[in-house]
Amino acid sequence: MNNIRILQGTYKIRGKDVDLSGMVFPLVEEFKVGAKGGYVTVDGKAVAGFPDRNIKIACNGAADYEDASGAQITKREETDEETIDRLRERFDMLEDMTRATKKGDVRAMIVSGPPGVGKSFGVEKVLGKHDLIAQLGDRPAKYEVVKGAMSAIGLYCKLYKFADKDNVIVFDDCDSVFADELCLNILKAALDSKKTRRIHWNTDSFKLRNEGVPDSFEFKGSAIFITNLKFDKSKGKIREHLMALESRCHYVDLTIDTEREKMLRIKQIVSDGMLSEYKFAEELHQEIIDFIDINKARLRELSLRTVLKVADLAKAFPMKWEAMAENTVMKR
């Protein structure tokens, strides 16, 4: 595949036409004219900041680009604004997908991202709003968040409890179900693409008899898995398990992989009002963010949770919160 240098051309990034003049891309297909005008097709995944697929660069003709076989592919860095917009879009999409899961349009979803960036908050916010009517009507909740370890029989019973349509089970950092083969087989049956999803427990169990759970039932609910695991980077036997589950789920990677992206996510959430309940002066808001940013390499965890810890200290110890934070949230 030859490289080409764009002499004159644009591509929409976050809804804005970005001038790509001078940038080098691998050529996929020569100039063509489509319904929206002329374009040349290049490999976007080769250049950072572009979609992981072929993209169409708008141009007027083949004269708007030239052969650049000996040139290096352009290394383009996202601006802070572009990164914040990308992350905001991802989290908005997470909320949209959660609504679709609640309605039953999406059977299952895996949400992958580092700890403390707001994965669980976005999911629970949407489900909590939908569940308000059930609470007001004194009806059983239609969703539950499961955390920690879970056995196969515990999983079977939980799925039975939320087997009805419009019910959702959220597995939040409950990664033990991914490693256990029996749990995985139960989940594969529950999330199968067939019209009828029937789950069976074929061994005698006192627990099932005691709780009135049948040895088979039809599962019509949905599931959301919130995890810190990167499925595509997993290795060994667990990779086979994760791939089997991923094939039955929509996979949402929040694309927060670097310290810079985590820090920009923190700045975005704070600017959106995360600390408003503390009623701090705007100057103190900025001091807290600056403290996190300056010391990010030494923090025990760069996350929204750490921001809240520092805010708690600023409220409790207005005159010495920085000294307190240095001793509680930073590595020694």
Regions found by a protein language model. Give the residues of each.
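AAA+/P-loop NTPase substrate/partner-engagement loops
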Residues: 129-167, 175-180
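N-terminal pre-Walker A segment at the start of P-loop NTPase domains
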Residues: 70-104
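Walker A/P-loop nucleotide-binding motif
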Residues: 103-123
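N-terminal accessory interaction module
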Residues: 1-75
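Conserved catalytic/switch belt of AAA+ P-loop NTPases
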Residues: 179-219, 226-228
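Conserved AAA+ ATPase small/helical "lid" subdomain
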Residues: 263, 270-330
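A short helix-turn-beta junction within AAA+ P-loop NTPase domains corresponding to the substrate/partner-engaging
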Residues: 236-257
